[in-house]
Each structure stands twice: as C-alpha cells, then as structure tokens.
Amino acid sequence: MTSSRPRLTSEPSDVPDGEQAQDPRTREEQAKNVCLRLLTVRARTRAELETQLTKRGYPDDVSARVLDRLTEVGLIDDEDFAEQWVRSRHLNAGKGKRALAVELRKKGVDDEVISSALADLDPAAERQRAEQLVRDKLRRERLDGTPENDVKVTRRLVGMLARRGYNQSMAYDVVSVELANERERRRV
C-alpha cells in the first residue's frame, strides 16, 4: 500500500556533496537548517541531531559548531528533553523508571541527566499508574476463580508491567492487590 503523502527527502541544499558545500559557512548554514527542520517536528537530543548530521555527511567539526550554537541559544537542552520525555511517556504510555531509562539512553542522554529526570518521578505516582494499567487490563480478563486461571492472569499482568519497565516485586504486589479487588468487585 502506498501512501498518498509525499515522502520527505533531503533538499539538495541540505546535503553537502563536494562542489556544492565547499564553503564552511555554507556547510554550517545547511547543517543548522537540517537541525532546525528536525527540531520543528519534535524536541531532540544533541546525540540524535549529531547522528542525523553524520548520516547526511557533515564533518564532525561543522556538526560540533552548529550543535554548540543551538545549545547556547537554548534550542537543544537534554535536561529539559529528558524531563519532558519522562513525564509524557509515564503518563501516556504507562512506562516505568527502568523502561524510561532505557529509552533515554537510546536517545543519547547522559546517565546523570537520566537519573535527575527519573528522580522527579514520584514512587507513589509510579505505583498509581501501574495500578491503573492493571485495573484496565483486569476488566477485560475472564476470572473463573480457579487457581490455574489466577496464576495465568497474574503471570500475564506481571509480564505486562515488567515489559513497561516496572520493578518486578512492585508489579507482583500491585497485581495481587488489584486481582483481589477485582474479584471482590465482581462478587457484588
């Protein structure tokens, strides 16, 4: 199936290719334009932008100067990016601390910045989000009261939380409590 939207490609002025981009100022201007275009789509880390510039063939010195300037004017801010990412992915995708740390590392965020961003995540809020995820899933589960079914449901729900980056002991505790609550709710 083909998309009706035109595919975005690099404009000729964005790609350095020997003759066209010999002047360092021109190269820097082109690299800056690439970064600005990428930043208009969504916030990005310095490492993500550096990767894009390298992929497009810009020399390291040009990339470093452009990225330093964008950082200096506040368009690149890994700390702010990490805080926004943690808040957004925790609330919208239900991710736990471990999964969030992995995602930020993949985006090239420094471990110290990751630790700082995750420190803002309240353990009570993390547990609350896990409880909500389990409650939402439990409403769709068939609970027949047999031990085999309970084990299967518990395993499935703990696995779901583990894949989202929640601590296994907390996940098991949340599932146990919410499973008991759901059984009680269905009895009434």
UniProtKB/Swiss-Prot annotation:
Leader peptide range in chain numbering: none
Xref: Gene3D superfamilies: Winged helix-like DNA-binding domain superfamily/Winged helix DNA-binding domain
Subcellular location(s) of the protein: Cytoplasm
Any one cellular-component term (Gene Ontology): cytoplasm
Ranges annotated as biased composition (Polar residues): 1-12
Alphabetically ordered keywords of this record: Cytoplasm
Region listing for Disordered, in residue ranges: 1-30
Chief location of this protein within or outside the cell: cytoplasm
Pfam families, alphabetized: RecX_HTH1, RecX_HTH2
Name of the protein: Regulatory protein RecX
Native species: Mycolicibacterium smegmatis (strain ATCC 700084 / mc(2)155)
